[in-house]
């Protein structure tokens, strides 16, 4: 899934957790389970960057509406950390993706299977957009109560 959905799932996990450390650890682990949902491309790289960038700004706004904005920013980082490590490592250094859930190599690999691989559900472009936008707007709506 895209970073917007991972971030909202992480924020909800942190909000429901008994303490921030447990919440952030669970937000990190959630990434691998969320990747069982196979997203579809939401457009060209430029279109995806505009959509995800806009959703990230809405997420940041929602964070500042909460009683603890830095905790929810940390939740976004924790829930996206596998991709934040892998993507730049692959793009800049040409290294294979260690955490990638969309291949059979890397972290948690056992006989070609791993957390998040292979995907269990494949979403269409419209479903992917709906989940990303809808979850971010949901977080914006509930942020005042966190």
Q: Can you annotate each of these PLM segments?
A:
Residues 1-146:
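N-terminal membrane-targeting hydrophobic helices
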